Amino acid sequence: LILTQMAAAEEATVYSVVSTDEKEKLAYEAGATKVFRYGEDLAEQIKAENGGGVDVVYDGVGQDTFAMCLNVTRPRGLVCSFGSASGDVEPFKIQELNAHGALFLTRPSLKHYVATDDEFLMRAQAVARAVEEGTVKIRVHPPYSLENARQALSLIHI
């Protein structure tokens, strides 16, 4: 939801993909332009919405969505795989990126973006400023007991 809020604040067209009605509502509240549900024809639905795919995909799911991410990205677009909620992406032939239109692929890690004290401070200040200005709203849930850990974990994935 934070990424959606930040992209929407920059006036990007934001497509979110979710699995439940509640997550759909949250995505729209965060600024998503259009929300889709996981399904077999997801890439085709998104391409139909904007006439040919997206420039950038941010994927926190991993294994279950990686092929769709490649299919929905426009030629010379960027796929940013930052999570593995469904498991790690299987090894693949790098030529796949060319077959989908000379795509760029990255797997960022926070430690590489806060490698120095100056970088850390700059990024921390940017996040704090976004929260102070109301660009990013952080949802805080009440604490859950250990018996309700499964319920608490179900709330952290969009």
Model-derived features: positions:
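Conserved small/polar residues in nucleotide/adenosyl-binding loops
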Residues: 156-158
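N-terminal Rossmann-like NAD(P) cofactor-binding module of classical short-chain dehydrogenase/reductase
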Residues: 57-58
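Non-catalytic, hydrophobic alpha-helical segments
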Residues: 127, 149-152
